[in-house]
Amino acid sequence: HRDLHSFPTRRSSDLSDPVLGPEMKSTGEVMGTGSSFGEAYIKSQHAADIKIPRTGTVFLSVRDPDKTEVFLNLARLLIKKDFKIIATEGTSDFLTRHNINSSYINKVHQGQPHIVDLIREGAIDLIINTTEGKQSIEESFSIRAEAVIRDVTYYTSLEASVATMDAFDYFSMVSVNRLQDYY
C-alpha cells in the first residue's frame, strides 16, 4: 500500500505556500492499496483529490542536482504521453542538449511573458518544479500560489513526479478491493 499525506490547499482560503518543508504537519491522510506500487500510488492520488492530467502542457523547472538521467527519462515519458514541455532557461537548455524538445518561458523575475502568465491563462496542465535554497524557493512562490488558485497539479520533488508518471498505466485499471484481499 501507499500512504499519502493530503494537504487541503484547494479548500483553504489563505494562500499558504504549498512547498513541503520539515515544519509542515499533516492535516489529513489517505491510503491507496494495490497489487503494485503504481496501482496503490494512483489510488492514493485519487483519494487525495489530486487531479492528474493525462496529456496537455507541462511546465518543467528543476534544480541542477535533479538534472539527471531519471529526469531525462521523465521528460521522454511525458512526451510519449503527448505532453508539450515548457521549461525555464536552464532546464530547457539541459533538455535540448539531450535531444528533448521544449519551449522556453521566462521565470517571473525575468519579465513577461513568464510562467505565471501561462498558468493564469489556463495554458499549463501540470507543474514539476524542484527548488533548492531560500532564494529559489522564494522566487517560485508565485508559481505555487497561482497553481493552487487555478487548481493545477504541482509536484515539488522529482521522486513524486516519477512515481506519478510510472502510475499512468494504472489509470484505466483502478479497482476497489477489500483490505482482506491483499493480506
How would you name each of these model-derived features?
Residues F59, D82-F94:
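Short internal beta-strands
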Residues D17-V58:
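Long hydrophobic segments that form regular secondary structure
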Residues D66-L77, T91-F94:
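N-terminal active-site wall of soluble small-molecule enzyme domains
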Residues H1, H5-S12:
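Short, small-residue-biased leader/transition segments that mark boundaries at the very start
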Residues F37-K43, V62-D66, K84-A87, N106-V116:
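A general structural motif
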Residues H46-V58, L78-K80, L118-I124:
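Glycine-rich phosphate/diphosphate-binding loops that line cofactor/substrate pockets in enzymes
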Residues N106-K107, Q112-Y183:
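Peripheral docking tails and interdomain loops at the edges
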